[in-house]
């Protein structure tokens, strides 16, 4: 159903915001559970269902993406279908977490009904139960840095009832010389190499001041 919204978040909103590189402590138990407790969604996309021990309102039956795998600076078309077993009303929300390796780049909560309207899907809350088939095209930002990105998106009703949990793992290869010359210098390459060094311990950011502890 609204899988295209989350996939848009995973690729457009999440990775665009990820270039700010807000590094935080890697101690999220919920993240570990999502990675271990997951099952691939039919269709060949990198997305899997997660939190399999919970009852979800949305049964995502299939997701197909073109191109597969995604490419930076290119459009990505997502086709999805699924069954919604209960209503979704105003106040529903989705949490999105993005990591580059073990580094947390983004952890944010979005208004699900607002995202539905702004993503031009022809849907608005309240949503009734039923079967949905959707197609959505989003743009993958050119400035996505190379690396393996892990994403977890969890959606909930206004009463905190689980709607769905999706997790994805997408790899963007190193930039070719011609691509580097066209890429905006939003991130210092030397800093990126340091951040991606597996020997490096993540810094813990002080939430009050924004400085490293």
UniProtKB/Swiss-Prot annotation:
- UniProt keyword annotations, A-Z: Lipid transport, Signal, Transport
Positions of the propeptide removed during maturation: 19-37
Which InterPro entries would you find in this protein's record? GM2-AP_sf, Ig_E-set, ML_dom, ML_PG-PI_TP, NPC2-like
GO terms for biological process, alphabetical: intracellular sterol transport; sterol transport
What range does the record give for the signal peptide?
1-18
CDD domains in UniProt:
PG-PI_TP
One GO location term (cellular component)? fungal-type vacuole lumen
Q: Which domain of life is it from?
A: Eukaryota
Question: Where in the chain are disulfide-linked cysteines found?
Answer: none
Q: Name one GO molecular function term.
A: phosphatidylinositol binding
Q: Which family does it belong to?
A: Belongs to the NPC2 family.
Q: What PANTHER family does this protein map onto?
A: NIEMANN PICK TYPE C2 PROTEIN NPC2-RELATED (PTHR11306), PHOSPHATIDYLGLYCEROL_PHOSPHATIDYLINOSITOL TRANSFER PROTEIN (PTHR11306:SF0)
Q: What does this protein do?
A: Catalyzes the intermembrane transfer of phosphatidylglycerol and phosphatidylinositol.
The record's note on quaternary structure and interaction partners says: Monomer.
Q: What is this protein called?
A: Phosphatidylglycerol/phosphatidylinositol transfer protein
Query: Which lineage do the record's taxonomy fields give for this organism?
Result: Eukaryota, Fungi, Dikarya, Ascomycota, Saccharomycotina
């Amino acid at each position: 159903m609204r899988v295209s919204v989350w996939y848009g978040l995973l690729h457009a909103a999440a990775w665009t915001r990820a270039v700010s590189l807000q590094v935080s402590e890697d101690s999220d138990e919920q993240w570990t559970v999502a990675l271990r407790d997951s099952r691939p969604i039919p269709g060949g996309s990198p997305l899997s269902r997660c939190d399999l021990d919970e009852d979800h309102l949305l049964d995502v039956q299939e997701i197909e993406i073109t191109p597969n795998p995604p490419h930076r600076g290119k459009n990505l078309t997502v086709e999805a279908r699924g069954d919604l077993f209960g209503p979704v009303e105003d106040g529903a929300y989705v949490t999105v977490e993005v990591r580059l390796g073990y580094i947390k780049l983004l952890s944010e909560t979005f208004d699900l009904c607002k995202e539905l309207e702004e993503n031009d899907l022809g849907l608005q809350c309240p949503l009734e139960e039923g079967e949905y088939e959707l197609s959505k095209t989003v743009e993958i930002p050119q400035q996505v840095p190379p690396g393996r990105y892990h994403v977890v998106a969890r959606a909930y009703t206004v009463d905190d009832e689980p709607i769905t949990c999706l997790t994805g793992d997408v790899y963007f290869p190193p930039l070719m010389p011609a691509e580097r010359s066209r890429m905006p210098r939003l991130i210092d390459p030397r800093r990126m190499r340091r951040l991606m060094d597996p020997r490096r311990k993540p810094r813990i950011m002080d939430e009050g001041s924004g400085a490293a502890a």
